[in-house]
Amino acid sequence: MNPASDGGTSESIFDLDYASWGIRSTLMVAGFVFYLGVFVVCHQLSSSLNATYRSLVAREKVFWDLAATRAVFGVQSTAAGLWALLGDPVLHADKARGQQNWCWFHITTATGFFCFENVAVHLSNLIFRTFDLFLVIHHLFAFLGFLGCLVNLQAGHYLAMTTLLLEMSTPFTCVSWMLLKAGWSESLFWKLNQWLMIHMFHCRMVLTYHMWWVCFWHWDGLVSSLYLPHLTLFLVGLALLTLIINPYWTHKKTQQLLNPVDWNFAQPEAKSRPEGNGQLLRKKRP
């Protein structure tokens, strides 16, 4: 199947020759550079304008900038995923093999983002000697999965777009963590955002069940359009997300609503500075 037309728009950012590897690889690089730019701009603006950011240690600043970058990507992914899930007739006509030019744009730029994300996470882990297993697995599977879609002109776009919709929680996660660091964990706004974020994580779980349903009813189309390693990677990743990662993150975010602490950093810092005023620091942290 050749990359499909997006319904007749003659001059559009989506109206490119996506059968060309040069176009697809260029957009992937553009996605990497764009989100690297978001990361750098966030650092510059936060350093200039935000007192909370200036008070953070280096590792927390990196996490802040990554959270903001993920939030921007989350907005892009949510818009694209919702349209694929609810509105695009071509994708709904063939959920296994249907393609759209606008989907090619999001797949290529998302591949660039996940490449950036993997580089950033691994560099951060190397520099700060940390390791988040679930996050590493999540983004490795995401990058390899979207890279598989990018190189395979036969791959359908519906499941790729609904996978992007799983990023619906990232803007709320970003807001939650930034407000937590700013000491706003008792505010009504933080609690409302936390409720919405938990709801988004539950929606993610429901969405994974829908994706399994699509796989079951369109199995023959998936087998004929995806390479076996790519299909295996997708199914293993979806299983990990459904059975382990989504439930774990939903549990942790619910815990955080009831006990608003920064579980990304509080425990390691407490261990690294156990003497003196370590207990006082733990109490001060939101």
Curated annotation (Swiss-Prot):
Record has Transmembrane helix as a keyword: yes
Gene Ontology biological process terms from the UniProt entry: adult walking behavior; associative learning; ceramide biosynthetic process; ceramide metabolic process; cholesterol metabolic process; glutamate reuptake; lipid biosynthetic process; lipid homeostasis
Pfam families for the chain: TRAM_LAG1_CLN8
Residues making up the signal peptide according to the UniProt record: none
GO cellular component: endoplasmic reticulum; endoplasmic reticulum membrane; endoplasmic reticulum-Golgi intermediate compartment; endoplasmic reticulum-Golgi intermediate compartment membrane; membrane; mitochondrion; presynapse
Free-text description of this protein's post-translational modifications in UniProt: Does not seem to be N-glycosylated.
InterPro entries the record matches: TLC-dom, TLCD
Ranges of residues in domain TLC: 62-262
Main location group: endoplasmic reticulum
Residue stretches spanning the membrane: 21-41, 62-84, 103-123, 131-151, 226-246
Entry keyword RNA-binding: no
Location of the motif ER-retrieval signal: 283-286
Molecular functions per Gene Ontology: ceramide binding
Keyword field: Disease variant, Endoplasmic reticulum, Epilepsy, Intellectual disability, Membrane, Neurodegeneration, Neuronal ceroid lipofuscinosis, Transmembrane, Transmembrane helix
Places the protein is found: Endoplasmic reticulum membrane; Endoplasmic reticulum-Golgi intermediate compartment membrane; Endoplasmic reticulum
Topology relative to the membrane: Multi-pass membrane protein
Job of this protein: Could play a role in cell proliferation during neuronal differentiation and in protection against cell death.
Involvement in disease: Ceroid lipofuscinosis, neuronal, 8: A form of neuronal ceroid lipofuscinosis with onset in childhood. Neuronal ceroid lipofuscinoses are progressive neurodegenerative, lysosomal storage diseases characterized by intracellular accumulation of autofluorescent liposomal material, and clinically by seizures, dementia, visual loss, and/or cerebral atrophy. The lipopigment patterns observed most often in neuronal ceroid lipofuscinosis type 8 comprise mixed combinations of granular, curvilinear, and fingerprint profiles.
Subunit and interaction comment: Interacts with CLN5. Interacts with CLN3.
Protein name: Protein CLN8
Source organism per UniProt: Homo sapiens (Human)
